[in-house]
């Protein structure tokens, strides 16, 4: 590309020009015995039940709310109890968890005044109000108040 005089001048000032290599034609031969690189495995899971974990937290400090959100992010059902949390921190914890619930498209259910259940979006939690009322009247599951 460059003539000899230009090349010498550029070499003198410290710039080296490399010749572009002409592309060589490479002949491709297909190996008859080679397996395709992107072979997808054919796996069928039979009889594997959904294994959903339930995590229970008895929170005492606001700093512990991160554990609830981390468990929810891992698609675990989380039950958390706020009975031992100072009154001024309860609303902050509920707000924090509510933000995580919104971001992760999860659901939060109030079990009692200070006990909540948070479920990931892949899980439906249905509460039968009639059954809940029956339990309350009989004193079964006192936390359902």
Curated annotation (Swiss-Prot):
This is Cell division protein SepF. Homodimer. Interacts with FtsZ. The keyword Hydrolase does not apply. It is found in: Cytoplasm. Belongs to the SepF family. Gene3D superfamilies: SepF-like protein. GO terms for biological process: division septum assembly; FtsZ-dependent cytokinesis. Residues 23-41 have a biased composition (Basic and acidic residues). The gene is sepF.
């Amino acid at each position: 590309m460059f003539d000899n005089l230009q090349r010498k001048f550029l070499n003198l000032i410290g710039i080296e020009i490399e010749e572009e290599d002409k592309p060589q034609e490479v002949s491709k031969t297909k190996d008859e015995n080679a397996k395709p690189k992107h072979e997808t495995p054919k796996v069928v899971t039979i009889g594997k039940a959904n294994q959903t974990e339930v995590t229970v937290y008895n929170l005492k400090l606001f700093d512990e709310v991160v554990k609830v959100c981390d468990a929810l992010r891992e698609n675990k059902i989380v039950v958390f109890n706020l009975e031992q949390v100072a009154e001024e921190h309860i609303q902050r914890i509920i707000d924090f968890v509510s933000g995580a619930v919104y971001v992760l498209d999860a659901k939060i259910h109030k079990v009692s005044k200070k006990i909540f259940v948070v479920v990931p979006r892949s899980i439906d939690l249905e509460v039968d109000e009639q059954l809940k009322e029956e339990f309350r009247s009989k004193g079964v599951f006192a936390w359902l108040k």
